[in-house]
């Protein structure tokens, strides 16, 4: 389970979805469920980005929140549907997504996505950022 904090709000990926706490972790509320699992949660400028997995449709969704995790907007309409989206990060004004088709970039907060680097056969990239450097770690079949 990954935990991130922004402006006093804690967010975490859990086996039931994405959970939120506004009192230092004493109480938690489920904020994204979709009948699935919380895969990842990341800090982005002004909020959070989350990846969830729906066990019924077998797809992963990518969403952002800019109000402390109260509401979430989908940003994955331009990404090919898949059960294996591994990560989403922000560097500067750009979002990057580790996807089975490769690494995608969005320069408009997820409205559109462009393939930057095609995938390696049977791999999906987990992305990590340090400053302005993006590290892409290939993994078999996603997370």
Indicate where each model-derived feature is located.
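Extracellular glycan-interacting surfaces
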Residues: 1-143
